[in-house]
A protein has these predicted regions:
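Conserved acid/base catalytic micro-environments in cytosolic active-site loops
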Residues: 2-30, 34-50, 56, 61-62, ...
Length: 380
């Protein structure tokens, strides 16, 4: 329900503004219709001296009003609230600042998963499951603060690093290096995509920009809870206009289709005769991620002898860097999302810093380059 902030909200905002002036740090807004949840999140955030709560709101309408007067770096957003609701309010929240990042705090229900994935596709950067009663423990606090810390860091350093990687006086690389066009003379068999925090929005933008004529199989490893994967697959199918499925052990990799890594195992690929098939492995990886991008790219490097085009989108950490290095050694080509459009320039930044990325660009430009790099199907 719309209206002026309640006395409690106004008092909290004034208090947090004074606190922000003293402490500085990552500015956090908490939006949830539950007073209990708002109070718990406030205590957790304020336990970190690098963060300050600039406001709390019991509705999306109140949050939008407060954000216009007290901008935040990170907004913790509940989607299921009376009135406007978090999903409907998301575009307006994102419009309050060019730099604001939204962390969706979602429920474990089917509706909660669908709304969360819709929010991530619209521009929310990351998600965190809201625990059941008694679940707001130290582990949860550590995970929450880690996500806020990653999202709230100033991107200026990342953008500056990207500028150093780019040619002097020019933008980030806008095309293949000399001699690398068509993957050093070989048509790729697969387009492989790795993504994490902020990657779903970027993935949607990139897939929508690929024309129907693009016929390569598309493999996607996205860091998400396994319970979200069926909803994620359905939403990707709608956004891309391509048949999309979760890759089980032994699933054939088919042209023009999208295969998504299951949330409880890594998607790997092996060759059986002339065909490629998916394998599922749950072995621990150095990145600690499940699913991990590294085994997908490393297995493709071997199965396709380097005939792979890989794209690393927005994400926290370094997952994908080792696999990208293996793929590059085998003759494959790697693209990376740029820092300015990434929610977190961790995964693409790691690839760029290692000088593995032929192209560093926004998602739509990556799609253009993919279609320019991959020729029409060869006559058989």
């Amino acid at each position: 329900m719309s209206g002026a902030p309640s006395p409690a909200d106004r008092g909290a905002t004034a208090e947090h503004k004074r606190s922000g002036e003293i402490r500085g740090g990552i500015r956090v807004m908490i939006v949830d219709d539950s007073l209990t949840v708002r109070t718990i999140f406030k205590r957790m955030v304020e336990s970190d001296r690098q963060m300050v709560v600039t406001g709390t709101a019991s509705s999306a309408e109140r949050a939008i009003v407060q954000l216009k007067g007290a901008p935040a770096d990170v907004v913790l957003l509940d989607l299921e609230m009376p009135g406007m609701g978090g999903l409907e309010a998301l575009p307006q929240i994102l419009a309050t600042s060019d730099d604001v990042q939204v962390l969706v705090v979602s429920s474990l229900t089917q509706d909660g998963a669908e709304h969360t994935l819709a929010a991530l596709s619209t521009g929310a950067a990351d998600t965190m499951l809201k625990p059941r009663p008694g679940g707001f423990n130290e582990d949860y606090r550590s995970q929450l603060l880690g996500k806020i810390r990653a999202l709230g860091r100033d991107t200026a350093e990342a953008i500056g690093l990207e500028a150093e990687i780019a040619p002097a006086g020019g933008p980030a690389r806008k095309g293949p290096r000399p001699g690398e066009r068509l993957l050093r003379g070989k048509r790729p068999e697969v387009l492989a995509v790795g993504a994490s925090t902020g990657g779903i929005h970027a993935l949607n933008l990139m897939l929508r920009a690929l024309t129907p004529e693009f016929d390569l199989p598309i493999l996607v490893t996205q860091h998400l809870p396994s319970s979200f994967m069926p909803v994620f697959a359905r939403q990707i199918e709608i956004a891309s206009g391509r048949r999309t499925h979760i890759a089980d052990d032994g699933t054939p990799i088919r042209p023009g289709e999208i295969a998504i890594a299951t949330g409880h195992g890594h998607m790997m690929v092996e060759r059986r005769g002339d065909d490629l098939v998916a394998r599922v492995c749950a072995d621990p990886m150095p990145s600690g991620c499940l699913p991990s991008v590294d085994p997908m790219l490393s297995s493709l490097a071997e199965a396709c002898e380097g005939r792979v085009l890989a794209v690393i989108l927005s994400g926290m950490g370094r997952d994908g860097a080792e696999g990208a290095a293996a793929l590059h050694r085998a003759g494959g080509t790697i693209y990376a999302q740029d820092a300015e459009t990434s929610a977190v320039w961790g995964m693409p930044g790691a690839v760029a810093k290692a000088d593995l990325a032929t192209l560093i660009a926004p998602p739509e430009m990556l799609a253009e380059a993919i279609m320019a790099l991959v020729p029409a199907p060869l006559a058989r």
